[in-house]
From Swiss-Prot:
Keywords: Amino-acid biosynthesis, Arginine biosynthesis, ATP-binding, Cytoplasm, Ligase, Nucleotide-binding
Protein name per the record: Argininosuccinate synthase
Subunit structure: Homotetramer.
InterPro entries: Arg_succ_synth_type2_subfam, Arginosuc_syn_C, Arginosuc_syn_N, Arginosuc_synth, Arginosuc_synth_CS, Arginosuc_synth_type_1_subfam, AS_cat/multimer_dom_body, AS_multimer_C_tail
Pathway(s) per entry: Amino-acid biosynthesis; L-arginine biosynthesis; L-arginine from L-ornithine and carbamoyl phosphate: step 2/3
This enzyme's EC code(s): 6.3.4.5
Major enzyme class: ligase
Keyword Iron listed: no
Chain residues that bind L-aspartate: 131, 135-136
Native organism: Bradyrhizobium sp. (strain ORS 278)
PROSITE patterns referenced in this protein's UniProt entry, alphabetically: ARGININOSUCCIN_SYN_1, ARGININOSUCCIN_SYN_2
Binding annotation for L-citrulline: 99, 135, 139, 192, 201, 203, 280
Length: 448
């Protein structure tokens, strides 16, 4: 049974994720004129570039919507963002700079909460502005059907009639103007931006060329720290966690997680913290490029990971990071609520995050340049006296203990030496010239 409709279902209720921009405004009016009963749904995700959320539903009504709703998704979005930090659900990084999966997190929330609102209104057909080449078309498809198993999908941008009549921005602007809406296209930027409270994504157009970089981007959550005329002063910040939850910034306790995140964004944004340039694999395995902002996510992530390394042992940290990489990829693919993702997430929250209580003090400078100044926690397993270079009373172990430990290593050293001789005898290894060490063939320039 197909769930994707290739043509407009006239006479039926059709829900559209409405942003108020040119594309969704033209699509809504066009669908109304072609005979659909249009219902508009707008997600308040705390977008930093949106000044008046209440105006968007009113605009939808003016374009012909029977009903228009503004759905406040901010609390749920922050909840999912904190869960991602707790579980380290980030798999894309370049040179130590991390992409915090802010768009996938936003889609998980939007795709479930808007479809749930539609279901309340008896709307079982959903359309949005995602294109067939991107990730969002699959993310929204999965989250929508998870929320409403009876959902049908209608996307104007997959409808050939819509494309033929309103195939570009100029045609859509002319269409709105012809129907009395006096819609003026905004000036074309050199790239496209999508944002929510957790972060912003800049991509496409000029940014598709790798010779264009961060310098053409105008940050919406931070400052252009790469410019000499951008004044950025060092700032000391204290972040406090209690049982994995961020609860205070600079001594100010927050009961509202949204307010805490807004303050974290403001603090990190003053420095351009969390801004990065990534090449990534989309769900369909083609590579894309994006420049990302996530000042609050970056600030909380740095403090959280500092506590993780001071509290948990090496094997736990290794498992946390390996599972986080896997979970990040599932999140990116639109599988944040799949059973395998829930298993990884719940494990990290239960066995890693629950122990994360303490304060981390940082000095923020420009961009991702920062220093850790202090780490305090009642749960720290870091105890400097265990390894102090000074003489201490009641030492955890003695020289004799270390001699015994090293002696036990003779077993695997002997086994390894035997294996190396075997590899040498079979030609896999050879002796380095002038030294009694083993050397792989390609180390000497052997390309075979």
């Amino acid at each position: 049974m197909t769930t994707i409709l290739k043509g407009l279902p006239t006479g039926e209720k059709v829900g559209i994720a409405f942003s108020g921009g040119l594309d969704t405004s033209a699509a809504l009016l066009w669908m109304k004129q072609k005979g659909a009963r249009c219902f508009a749904y707008t997600a308040n995700l705390g977008q930093p570039d949106e000044s008046d959320y209440d105006e968007i539903p009113r605009k939808a009504m003016s374009f012909g919507a029977e009903k228009a709703r503004l759905v406040d998704c901010r609390t749920q979005l922050v909840h999912e963002g904190i869960a991602a930090i707790q579980s380290g659900a980030f798999h894309i990084s370049t040179g130590g700079a991390t992409y915090f999966n802010t768009t996938p997190l936003g889609r998980a929330v939007t795709g479930t909460m808007l479809v749930a609102a539609m279901k309340e209104d008896g709307v079982n057909i959903w359309g949005d502005g995602s294109t067939y080449k991107g990730n969002d078309i699959e993310r929204f498809y999965r989250y929508g059907l998870l929320t409403n198993p009876n959902l049908k999908i209608y996307k104007p941008w997959l409808d050939q009639q819509f494309i033929d009549e309103l195939g570009g921005r100029a045609e859509m602007s002319a269409f709105l103007t012809a129907h009395g809406f006096n819609y003026k296209m905004s000036a074309e930027k050199a790239y496209s931006t999508d944002s929510n409270l957790l972060g912003a994504t800049h991509e496409a157009k000029d940014l598709e060329s790798l010779s264009s970089g961060i310098r053409i981007v105008n940050p919406i959550m931070g400052v252009p720290f790469w410019r000499e005329d951008c004044a950025v002063r060092p700032e000391t910040v204290v972040v406090r966690f209690e049982e994995g939850q961020p609860v205070a910034l600079n001594g100010q306790t927050f009961t509202d997680p949204v307010a805490l995140f807004l303050e974290a964004n403001a603090i990190g944004g003053r420095h351009g913290l969390g801004m990065c340039d990534q090449i990534e694999n989309r769900i369909i395995e083609a590579k894309s490029r994006g420049i990302y902002e996530a000042p609050g996510m970056a600030l909380l992530h740095i403090a959280y990971e500092r506590l993780v390394t001071g509290i948990h042992n090496e094997d736990t940290i290794e498992q946390y990071r390996m599972s986080g990489m896997k979970l990040g990829r599932l999140l990116y693919q639109g599988r944040w609520f799949d059973s395998q993702a829930l298993m990884l997430r719940e494990t990290a929250q239960r066995w890693v995050a629950s122990a994360i209580t303490g304060e981390v003090t940082l000095e923020l400078r420009r961009g991702n340049d920062y220093s850790l100044l202090n780490t305090e926690s009642p749960n720290l397993t870091y105890q400097p006296e265990r390894l102090s270079m000074e003489k201490v009373e009641d030492a955890a172990f003695t020289p004799a203990d270390r001699i015994g430990q090293l002696t036990m290593r003779n077993l695997d050293i002997t086994d390894t030496r035997t294996k190396l001789k075997l590899y040498s005898d079979t030609g896999l290894l050879s002796g380095a010239e002038g030294a009694q060490i083993f050397q792989l063939g390609h180390d000497k320039g052997d390309k075979s």
